[in-house]
Every structure is written in C-alpha cells, then in structure tokens.
Regions:
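Cytochrome P450 heme-thiolate "Cys pocket" and heme-binding signature region
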Residues: 68, 104-133, 158-161
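Central I-helix of cytochrome P450 enzymes
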Residues: 1-19, 46, 73, 77-81, ...
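Conserved cytochrome P450 K-helix E-x-x-R motif and the immediately C-terminal K′/meander segment
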Residues: 27-68, 89
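C-terminal helix/juxtamembrane-tail motif
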Residues: 166-188
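Conserved beta-strand elements of beta-rich interaction domains across eukaryotes
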Residues: 77, 84-85, 120-121, 135, ...
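Short conserved micro-motifs at the rims of enzyme active sites and ligand-binding pockets
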Residues: 90-92, 127, 183-188
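Conserved cytochrome P450 K-helix/beta-meander segment immediately N-terminal to the heme-binding cysteine loop
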Residues: 33, 50, 62-64, 80-106
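Cytochrome P450 heme-binding "Cys pocket" and the immediately downstream C-terminal segment
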Residues: 8-10, 126-166, 170
Length: 188
C-alpha cells in the first residue's frame, strides 16, 4: 500500500482493472485474483522491491563446491540475499524504481524473481500468501480511495531494522469509501 500511495497512477490503474473485471456490485473473490493481471504485477513488483525477508533460510553446503568462482568448503552456512538479487542492475532495468509494468510481458519474473525461494526448499505457503495478498490488496483498492496523510508528502519508504525489513516510519494513510461501493460495504 505504501508504494501505491506514492504511485497514484498505479493505484488508479489497479482500481480500474478491478472495476472492469469484478464490477462494483460484489467484493473481489478468490476466483477473481488470477484474472487481475495488473494487480498481480503490483504484488510481484512490491515483493521484488521489498521481499518478506531479505535473505532466504540458511542452508549448509554438503560438500566442497564453487559458487560464482569462489571456493565454498563443505559445511559452510550459505545465505541467499534476495534483496540484493531483486535490485541487481545486471538483472533489472532501473532496479530501484517501482514499475509494475515490468511484469506484464511473458517471462519477466523468471530466474531472478524469488521472494519465496526456489526449488525443493521454496516456501510451501507461496500460493496461499499470493492469494491472500491479492484478496486483501484487491479488496482495499476496490472499496476505498486512498491518499497519503495531508501535508505529509510522499510516504517514507526508509527501511527499519528487523528480520522482515519493517518501515522505519509506520504507514499513515487516509481512506474514504468509494461511493460506488457503499451499498456493498453496508451489507457486510
């Protein structure tokens, strides 16, 4: 949500997609999320810039090996820095920019996009997490108009300290129910 508040054009594009695909007579449902391509692009770009954890779960090398030309003795603890991989200029054009459109073309999420890990040790909750994120963010976008707190300027995206990279400054946002969704919200 923080990134969308700083990029209102992306927020409006996601809202327009939801309105066109789902309408305003019901809430976004689980079956809708796979059809909301731009919303999924927003989620992918957000997870690229701010993975849930900056490094994957540590692993231990079972034997001597070479990684990137470096000798790694057996028994060495290995960490994969997803945060750095997702911001590597060799893999991503303009890596610090929030550009959900980069995921619109086929194969854009390829090898270098791995917020949940990859292979046998990939997070088993990835599908559930993406479905839940799609439902929650989609519903928030569908039901409310969002803005940064008046006079605050852009949302501060500075990172705090912690395993999950929390914001240094907690998010404060203003939301107003969308007039077209008031009847649906009343029925909840």
């Amino acid at each position: 949500m923080s990134l969308l508040l700083n990029h209102q054009e992306a927020l409006k594009k996601a809202q327009a997609e939801i309105d066109a695909s789902v309408g305003t007579s019901r809430l976004v449902g689980a079956a809708d999320v796979p059809r909301l391509g731009y919303l999924r692009c927003v989620l992918s770009e957000t997870l690229r810039l701010y993975p849930v954890v900056p490094t994957l779960i540590p692993h231990e090398s079972t034997a001597d090996c070479a990684v990137g030309g470096h000798h790694v003795p057996g028994g060495t603890m290995l960490l994969v820095n997803v945060y750095a991989i997702h911001r590597d200029p060799a893999a991503w054009a303009d890596p610090a920019a929030f550009r959900p459109e980069r995921f619109e073309s086929a194969g854009a999420d390829g090898l270098f996009m791995m917020p949940f890990g990859m292979g046998r040790r990939k997070c088993p909750g990835e599908a559930l997490a993406l479905q839940t994120l799609g439902l929650v963010l989609g519903t928030l976008i569908q039901c409310f108009d969002w803005a940064a707190v008046a006079g605050a300027g852009e949302v501060d995206m500075a990172e705090g300290v912690g395993i999950t990279l929390p914001r240094a400054v907690p998010l404060e946002a203003m939301c107003k129910p969308r007039q077209c969704m008031v009847d649906v919200l009343r029925e909840l």
